[in-house]
Curated annotation (Swiss-Prot):
InterPro entries: NagB/RpiA_transferase-like (IPR037171), Ribose5P_isomerase_typA_subgr (IPR020672), Ribose5P_isomerase_type_A (IPR004788). One of its GO terms (biological process) is D-ribose metabolic process. It catalyses: aldehydo-D-ribose 5-phosphate = D-ribulose 5-phosphate. NCBIfam families: PRK00702.1, rpiA. GO terms for cellular component: cytosol. Catalyzes the reversible conversion of ribose-5-phosphate to ribulose 5-phosphate. This is Ribose-5-phosphate isomerase A.
Amino acid sequence: MTGELSPIDKAKFVAAKRAADLVEDGMRVGLGTGSTAAWLVRCLGDMVRKEGLKMRGVPTSTRTAQLAREVGIEVITLDEARWLDITIDGADEFDGDLNLIKGGGGALLQEKIVATASDQMVVIADLGKEVSRLGAFPLPVEVIPFGWQTTQALLEETLISMDVLGRTATLRMNGDTPFVTDEGNHILDLHLQRIGNARQLALVLNQIPGVVENGLFIDICDTVVVGHGDGRVEIRDINQGTVEHDRLDFVESDNLFTDLAD
């Protein structure tokens, strides 16, 4: 039941439900990856089944694609869509300029490609994801498997000259083996603690041989929908400079997501 969800899960639910209202008939929608984005996919699936919403989704990972199909969303590829009306995704951190750290779910490469191929990117989050300065959450960097330890050493050497507090890179694991992305790559998590110049860091990291992409999303996000455990929602639009307040009531039948609770 909805009442059994934690305040954080309630916050994710109301943010996802409010963001789903931004999707209109005929839209091509980028579908993010991760626990928060999964709530959004379920909300959209509910609208497809119960309200007849006509939309097509471009998933950013195989597991998002599987979930989208399960809830009745028509799934197409980005090349089939060519361009997207909106992408809705979660974030590991966002700052006051709506710059993001993403990739905690391991899909940062496809997430960034899909987000930049969209007219607008909307992030759904709980208030705990907001930070004054990025960097407390480890920054994911996707690297090719060949020579990943050399790439790791190059990353740590590069960080010496960057405005960050920490400079350790660790290989993300999946049990006893390295985590493998949908594209067959590894992820190195950079433990930076604080990032002084995120824009500069994003550019520098991608110049290192072996690096495919990093999890800094700079000037990509247009709107963040922040959910609260009591049903309050804030919609912050960085382009319009506006903050809209809303409130969603919890109804027990609304909770389609007990299996997604963290």
